[in-house]
Amino acid sequence: VDYFARPSLSAIAGGIALGLSISPFANAESAADNTLQKGVLEEVLVTARKRSESMQDIPIAVTAISADSLRERGISNTSELTKSVPSLEIRKGQANQIYIRGIGERTGFARVDPTVGVYLDDLFLPRSDGQLLDTVDIASIQVLRGPQGTLFGKNTTGGAMVVSLQKPDAEPAAYVEAGVGNYAQRRLKAGVNWPIGDHFFTRAAINITKDDGYFENVATGQNNPTNDRQSLLLQTRWEASEHFSLDTQAFLGKIRENLSGINCSVPSQEALYIQGLWVAHPGDTDPANLRAFQENCDANSRERLGDLKSNQGPNPRLQKDLDTALLAATADWQISDTLSLKSVIGLRGEKEGPIQASDPDGGPALWSSYINTEDSDRRSYSFELQLNGSAFEQRLRYTAGLFAMQETNSENFTVSNSIRGIDSQTLAELALSQSPTRPVPGGTVPLVGFIGAPLVVSDFELENTTLAAFTQASFDINQQLELTLGYRITEEQRQSELSTTEADMAAIEQRLLGSGLFGNGTNIGVFGPGAGGFFPYLGPLGWRDDPVSIAAALFPDADGDALHDYPLDPNTRRKDIGDETFRQATPMVSLAYTLPDHWLDGELLNSALFYATWSRGFKSGFFEPRGVDGLQRINPEVVTNNEIGFKIDAFERSVRINGAFYHMDFDDQQLIAVGSDSAQNVVVVFGNAGQSEIRGAELELLWLPSSALQINASLSINNYRYIEFTELDLQSAIVGQEKFVDRSNETFPVSPDKSASLGVQYTWSGDIGIVTSRLDLSYKSDVFYGFDPASYAAFKDSPEKAGQPAYALLDGRLTWQNPAGDLSVSAWAKNITDERYRIGVVAVADSSGTYNQAWGEPRMFGLDLRQLF
């Protein structure tokens, strides 16, 4: 249902002709007059196998996007690639979520590795927070789909993203790019390439991106999500001789942004905090009609507030502060005509400020909060050695190497829960492991207390050490048949230390008793030892006095940190240590067949490659905190990929069609879900699904009907399903029963089953220069954003209850380039039809009963200018 009328933007869209594509041009700076004369597809070079090769000659499902294409499409951040790259999903937020073929990691916790490896000039970036790179001085981006466990190592069960920078060279050059747009968008990029002598070259680039956000928090009057990123990139290249070069880079990044606000809705009335446990919240005065939790969520609903507005209270803690520093050096030695050696060393540090991790209640009230309350520090040091060679007149091509990395992470997070109410009859029934009677009969005694510990402060210290050795070789059996074998062995040591401190229940009890309004607590430990007992309300009007509000007022947020001021008990401090080494081999084998020349028709079919690949990917296990149970071991996940594909150039190389069909088997897939610990506290934790599988197909089409017209299309269809996945029923576990739920019928979260893109780009040339118009169209099918079985049931009933129904986005761009080719001006619009679509965050229908929804960008438009020097 479209609740809001949206203004037309025909004046902006009218001058933009249909267009969409990944540009076929691989060079970073194509001259304007030369580009127009090319009526055939150019060769695209990629480094997916650690050596420069034609994309059409390698048995890997890869999409390559050049710097020209990024500018033509107006892509300023790699997150925008999700619109056109098959099976790729990227979500921005506190944790940058990158998914390929349904495989991804959605939390951003320091203890959990991502499943898509991101590489910057051969340097592995281990954390997801810094992986969404602004496209500053980028030469190309390659997206490798499917496990890349042999050459790229751990954390590539989904695939890899390889980002290559423009490198310093001998030609002095500079550029400036500036942009403005609605919502106070301001962008500035600038770079200069400056040689110092004949053998030493330097390059520097800056990026500043800011805007004021489009989503208003009515409680504060501030907008979110805002962009406020600044970065500086310095590079050098020393060509010491004809055979040896040394590249260095230094990167400094500063982020001061607000994350996206949310709206709240209730997907299930049977949730624990709504009707499941029949507990009261501040504002509830009738035990037979508990409405406060629902009303709190409704106060932050889109239906009540209107379009692009939220109500998350006066201190939602959405500020994201992240400082990043990176140093790297790459030495390349051409030992002989057939042998080269490369070494890559990197040092990386990050500091992230306090930030809200989750708001389970979803509304303005301060009832449940997960907050990182201290700075988080991350350090990593890595070294890689690559030996590339060939033999037998290039029939054998091989790569071998070693990889080592040490990473340290510190993470502080605090879980805070408001005091809640319960009637005496319900408490007695829960103590007997019985479901509560509803509605509650009149005349019951109100009690106040906690479901789970009121406050838990956790400090996580982690140290990860990775060692790996790898080799891969391709051999031409004959002119048409290539066999590739690869093998990698990875050893991953995980050391985790978790320190927790809980609230002082004796001090909380004294404050309640000291008020004179509450009696001595019961000894019924229904919700675990950390929760304490329940205290009867002694006021004259019973429930009509709103006893939960009276109790909650005794523990205000006096310091404004979005946490209740419960006293901590140092005697509850405990320390858990986990230390284990995980080892895994990730082999691969591939057979590629190239059609012989006598099968090819120069006009109809120009080249054709068919391949079959078997490969394996690995993601390390780790230790997960599970409430009072301390650290629990999470098994590694392993993916086995069976894939066949083809790559075809046809019709005098004016058409390129690449496709792949795959069947991927998952063992011990790592998933986050809502569960309980042994003391019956509700916890959000990782676990392993026994087995799951992915079956899918991908297709990319690029067609140049003429030198001025370019048509692109992409399609991905995936079927995700769990084969073995059971977990304890949450409500039964909370009341002390053991009942298992089969979740094998559920789909994977975040990734749609189907995605597609289609469009056309047209270019005119004349005395005034070159005018290029394009329109990008992208489509996503239904997306599930839930954590638990009840969320999936709500999603199946209606996708908008716990996900996002299918939607399409339309982007347009009109660019003029002067005859000299050194000045261009672009008018652009994104989401031209002003579509409203959800991009998360999460639905939890079994416990809190809320669906917290962040919304994608509304219609955006602006102007860009680029000047070359």
Question: Regions from the language model: what does each represent?
Answer:
Residues 398, 479-483, 491, 660-665, ...:
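Gram-negative outer-membrane beta-barrel transporters
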Residues 114-115, 127, 136-145, 150-232, ...:
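Outer-membrane beta-barrel translocator/receptor signature
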Residues 422, 606, 706, 778-793, ...:
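C-terminal beta-signal and adjacent terminal beta-strands/loops
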Residues 239, 387, 397, 401-405, ...:
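Structural signature of Gram-negative outer-membrane beta-barrels, strongest in the C-terminal barrel
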Residues 36-171, 644:
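Acidic, small-polar-rich N-terminal luminal/periplasmic segments of exported/outer-membrane proteins
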Residues 162, 170-171, 177-179, 191-287, ...:
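Periplasmic-side early beta-strands and strand-to-turn transitions of outer-membrane beta-barrels
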